[in-house]
Amino acid sequence: MRPLSPPPAGWFCVLAGVLACVLGPVGSWAVGLQQEECDYLQMIKVQHKQCLEEAQLENETSGCSKMWDNLTCWPATPRGQVVVLACPLIFKLFSPTQGLNVSRNCTDEGWTPLEPGPYPIACGMDDKASGLDEQQTVFYNSVKTGYTIGYSLSLAALLVATAILSLFRKLHCTRNYIHMHLFISFILRATAVFIKDLALFDSEESDHCSKGSVGCKAAVVLFQYCVMANFFWLLVEGLYLHTLLAVSFFSERKYFWGYIFVGWGVPSTFIMVWTVVRIHFEDYGCWDTIHSSLWWIIKAPILASILVNFILFIRIIGILVQKLRPPDVGKSDNSPYSRLAKSTLLLIPLFGVHYIMFAFFPDNFKAEVKMVFELIVGSFQGCVVAILYCFLNGEVQAELRRKWRRWHQQGVLGWDSKYQHPSGGSNGDTCSTQVSMLTRVSPSARRSSSFQAEVSLV
């Protein structure tokens, strides 16, 4: 009998994807196959090639010819004999029972189906694994839907907020420039998530072990850069606000370019190093695996930024406590505590303080809870930041009302702008009264006014 024809080229991709889904919640399988699993799949490819070459060299027999069934090479066998082989080695990674065998019988009609059943059942992956696979599929689809909604809302809100801060010149100042860069980092992060999902899940590049395409790797590199840049711009927000409160006098223009370097330059440095190292040492798959020592090139700077921002957050809350403390100790006044609570809640999304909850836990600790918190809750952070620091900002609302009154008057009364009375100040007055002109007052008054501009909702 003739040997079976080779399986389609994408069969190994399907095998890798199925094995990844079957293992469900354990951390490594949630994102892709590790190097050990990839080694097994590579071994299967080698065995497949060797089996087909040997089958072509063998003479025709009256029994069953050598056959490759996508996992095991069955030797040429006379009719009437049963061949018993051990389960493929790859099943030992996730089957609790070891030492299981599979068999086929050579008959006049050829090889019989696999006994005692298909590989998943015969080698220890039974209904429990299938049920787990189905549950995890539902869970991951729900998570993907959740963060897709969150990033979509954030993207829409951030685009509008960035346009507002960019178009109205009276809102141009260092503080709002930093806000705009933070908004842009959130926009890039949301966009990169959609591109990565398109490259990894909505395309045929599901094999995490073969050499991925340049486009797929580029999508992952872009995603990692945007995520790191977003964390570093959260750090810049913390550094800027802390500097306003702690430093008597400083050049905002000089510091601003330093903030630009921290927000965009530092992440690009780490990502370039990570990219070069992966090309030389782990250039397999689509670079979406995170369970190797190389992942710390990205993870360590992000953890450091989260920790520093949390420390800055605690220090700023301490300054708030001092500033909002009632002057009369004997007087009972709940207003300062209410303002402190509002200020704290206002700063949490700006500093990304919520990330500290799971930042220093192992990746496989409460993996599903961590995934929901970081992916779904984190996806709405950009929307919350845009609402708090643009749409609910007093300066923005005042400028929008002023523009609306002018447009309304021009539309209803036909007024021309050249006949309008000049505004009370030049472009940028709104921000200059909040930040730039603070250099003309005492350090304590300057720090107080600047901070009040940040927490104008309180």
From Swiss-Prot:
Disulfide bonds join C38-C209, C51-C73, C64-C106, C87-C123, C216-C286. SUPFAM superfamilies: Family A G protein-coupled receptor-like, Hormone receptor domain. GO terms for biological process: adenylate cyclase-activating G protein-coupled receptor signaling pathway; adenylate cyclase-modulating G protein-coupled receptor signaling pathway; cell surface receptor signaling pathway. One of its GO terms (molecular function) is peptide hormone binding. Residues 32-142, 198-217, 278-292, 361-368 are extracellular. The chain crosses the membrane at residues 143-167, 176-197, 218-242, 256-277, 293-317, 340-360, 369-392. Residues 1-31 form the signal peptide. Gene3D superfamilies: GPCR, family 2, extracellular hormone receptor domain (4.10.1240.10), Rhodopsin 7-helix transmembrane proteins (1.20.1070.10). The keyword Endoplasmic reticulum does not apply. The keyword Ubl conjugation does not apply. Residues 168-175, 243-255, 318-339, 393-458 are cytoplasmic. Keywords: Cell membrane, Disulfide bond, G-protein coupled receptor, Glycoprotein, Membrane, Receptor, Signal, Transducer, Transmembrane, Transmembrane helix. Glycans are attached at N59, N70, N101, N105. GO terms for cellular component: plasma membrane. It is a multi-pass membrane protein. It is found in: Cell membrane. Its main location: membrane. G protein-coupled receptor activated by the neuropeptides vasoactive intestinal peptide (VIP) and pituitary adenylate cyclase-activating polypeptide (ADCYAP1/PACAP). Binds VIP and both PACAP27 and PACAP38 bioactive peptides with the following order of ligand affinity VIP = PACAP27 > PACAP38. Ligand binding causes a conformation change that triggers signaling via guanine nucleotide-binding proteins (G proteins) and modulates the activity of downstream effectors. Activates cAMP-dependent pathway. Belongs to the G-protein coupled receptor 2 family. Interacts with ADCYAP1/PACAP; activated by both PACAP27 and PACAP38 neuropeptides. Interacts with VIP; the interaction results in VIPR1 activation. PANTHER family: PDF RECEPTOR-LIKE PROTEIN-RELATED (PTHR45620), VASOACTIVE INTESTINAL POLYPEPTIDE RECEPTOR 1 (PTHR45620:SF24). This is Vasoactive intestinal polypeptide receptor 1.
